[in-house]
Curated annotation (Swiss-Prot):
Source organism: Stevia rebaudiana (Stevia)
Alphabetical keyword list: Glycosyltransferase, Transferase
EC nos: 2.4.1.-
Family: Belongs to the UDP-glycosyltransferase family.
Name of protein: UDP-glycosyltransferase 88B1
Lineage per the UniProt record: Eukaryota, Viridiplantae, Streptophyta, Embryophyta, Tracheophyta
Positions annotated to bind UDP-alpha-D-glucose: 278, 340-341, 358-366, 380-383
Amino acid sequence: MESSKVILYPSPGIGHLVSMVELGKLIHTHHPSLSVIILVLPATYETGSTTTYINTVSTTTPFITFHHLPVIPLPPDSSSEFIDLAFDIPQLYNPVVYNTLVAISETSTIKAVILDFFVNAAFQISKSLDLPTYYFFTSGASGLCAFLHLPTIYKTYSGNFKDLDTFINIPGVPPIHSSDMPTVLFDKESNSYKNFVKTSNNMAKSSGVIANSFLQLEERAAQTLRDGKSITDGPSPPIYLIGPLIASGNQVDHNENECLKWLNTQPSKSVVFLCFGSQGVFKKEQLKEIAVGLERSGQRFLWVVRKPPSDGGKEFGLDDVLPEGFVARTKEKGLVVKNWAPQPAILGHESVGGFVSHCGWNSSLEAVVFGVPMVAWPLYAEQKMNRVYLVEEIKVALWLRMSADGFVSAEAVEETVRQLMDGRRVRERILEMSTKAKAAVEDGGSSRVDFFKLTESWTHK
C-alpha cells in the first residue's frame, strides 16, 4: 500500500523552520498514518544556522524526513537585497522542487503541500501537479489580516508608505501607522512589495491558510478573516488557526545550562529576560544604554547579548561592548550571556517575570503560553506591526519609547522595565491568555477543532 505524505516547504532560517517542524509534529501526533517530508533550501544568505537544530530533530523525530535540495549557484545578476533573494531563490529551485514532488508521488500519495509564504514561487508547481496546496503563515491572525489586505492597500493608497505619514486602515486590526509597516513595503513599486502582493493573491486561491495563533488571542482578526473581509475583490480561502505551535523547553537540562542553573537560585517572578531573536543585534552605543538602564532599574535580569555588527567575524568579550565594570557590578542581580540562550525553557521558568522582546511572533507566542508579560522592542520585518497588535489589541505588552531611528535611551529602559515588573494589568491579562492558549489545544479547543477540519480531507480519501 502506498504511504501518505505531507510535504512542508519552509523558507531558509531558523524561525520559519521551527514553526514548520512543530506543525509536522502536530500532524503526525494526531494522524500517525501521515509522515512528513520537509524540503530544505540551502541558505544562500545569512539566516542563522539550522544545522544543529535539523540534526537534533532528525535524531528525535524519525517520522519527519528532511530532504535537502541541492545547491544551485545564484545567477551573476542576482539581487543583493535579502528580501528579494528570499523570493527569488525559491523561483530558481522550482524545477528541482517539481522533480522532487514527482519522484515522491511515484512511491507515495501526497495528501498536501504546505508552503511558507516566502516560497510562493512553488505554488504554480504544486498546483500544476494537482496537489492540495496550503500556505503556513508563521505569524498571527492580525498579521494575516494585513497580508491578505495588501492587494487592496496597493490599489487604495497612491503614495509610498515611507512618504505617507498616515494611518493605514486594515479590517480586523487597529490602525497601523505607515511608518510601522515593514520597511520592505515602503516603496510600492519595489520588487519586494510586488512579491508580497503576488503571494497574497495566491494565498486567496489556495486550499487554505494555516496561521500560528488561536481564536481567543485574536478574536476580532479571526472573525474578520472568517467573514472574508480581508479580501475585497474575490473569495477568501479557508483559514485555520491551529496554534500556539511553539518548541518546548523540555529538552534542556536545568542542571547543566548556565542560564537555568542561575535562574534556579532566583526568587519567583523576579527576573526580566532580554532576548531579541536570531537576527537581533545592536550597536555598542545601544548596548551601553540598555546596560545603564538595567542597572538603574534595580531589577534582576538575564540578558542575551549578540555580537555588534561592527565587530565583524572576530570573537567578542562582554567587557568590550558593555560599560566598564558592568558585569562585575551587577553579578549579584544579573547574568549576561553571549549569543544564545534556551528561550522556551527560560520563559517557562518560575523565576522569570518579564520579557523584553523583539516582537517576533514565535517569541511572542512563547511568552503568551508561559504567561510572561512583555516590553515590545521591534527591530525588523513585521515586528512593528506585531507591537501594535500586542500592545493595543491583545494588551499583553508595554510600549517602549524610542526615537524615530529606533534608538532607546537608558531612561526609557529603566522606566519601562520597572513598569513591567511592578505592574499588574498586563501581567493579569497575559495570565488569562496563557490559560486560554492551553485550552485551545486541548480536545474540543478551538485550535484542535480547526486542525481536524484542516486534516479531515487528507485522511478520508
